[in-house]
From Swiss-Prot:
Binds 1 Mg(2+) ion per subunit. One of its GO terms (biological process) is thiamine diphosphate biosynthetic process. The gene is thiE. The lineage of its organism: Bacteria, Bacillati, Bacillota, Clostridia, Eubacteriales. This is Thiamine-phosphate synthase. 2-[(2R,5Z)-2-carboxy-4-methylthiazol-5(2H)-ylidene]ethyl phosphate binds at T134, G135, S136, G165, I185, S186. 4-amino-2-methyl-5-(diphosphooxymethyl)pyrimidine binds at Q37, V38, R39, E40, K41, N69, S108, K137.
Length: 205
């Protein structure tokens, strides 16, 4: 599957406002989302599995890749396209042994050293951040800004997406770095019109 990282949605059910996750994801895809990561913290394995399976029904229908945050077991159970791992999650080499060469493995990085290490270890793509202050993620170690993003982007050759505080007012500045895509949560999920919110984040709409 050819991966288009242009508009990368990360799910967060705290923003649903009573809406169904499946419907929200579908509207986001119809608005232009090209890849979806299911991210669930502090839930049981059973609940995570059920949520991921539900989202996969939508992504499969629209032929959009689905990535699972952190949990290799969930990724395997639903046959997701891959996983996204943080710096404190399972080592990439071990994840690759478990998932095989055909699955996508993305790694979160915040500096050039982490980026080069992930690339050298065989990451398929990188999530670079945090770019701007954000309310979605509380344990932000360092805001790297556009300059930090550019330095990391210039040091690597694999695809990457920027994450952290990206919205319709600043995403064009982020894309000027040459990055393959932007990763968002609240910029889409916290809006009333999900489809329009996604569409507003496309450079060539």
């Amino acid at each position: 599957m050819e991966i288009n990282y242009e508009l990368y949605l990360i799910t967060d059910r705290r923003f649903l406002k009573g809406r169904q996750l499946k419907k929200v994801v579908e509207d986001a895809i119809l608005g232009g989302v090209t890849i979806v990561q299911v991210r669930e913290k502090d839930v049981s394995t059973k609940e995570f599995y059920n949520v991921a399976k539900e989202v996969k029904e939508v992504t499969d229908y629209y032929r959009v890749p689905i990535i699972i945050n952190d949990r290799l077991d969930i990724a395997q159970a639903i046959d997701a396209n891959g996983v996204h791992l943080g710096q404190k999650d399972m080592h990439l080499n071990i994840a690759r042994e478990i998932l095989g060469k055909d699955k996508i493995i993305g790694i979160s990085v915040g500096n050039v050293k982490e980026a080069l290490e992930a690339q050298n270890n065989g990451a398929d793509y990188l999530g670079i951040g945090t770019i701007f202050p954000t309310g979605s993620k509380k344990d932000v170690d360092a805001i790297i800004g556009i300059d930090g993003l550019s330095k990391i982007k210039d040091s690597i050759s694999i695809p990457s997406v920027a994450i952290g505080g990206i919205n319709k007012t600043n995403f064009k500045d982020v894309l000027k770095t040459g990055i393959e895509g932007i990763s968002v949560i609240s910029a889409i999920l916290d809006e009333d019109d999900i489809k329009l919110a996604a569409n507003n984040l496309l450079i060539n709409k």
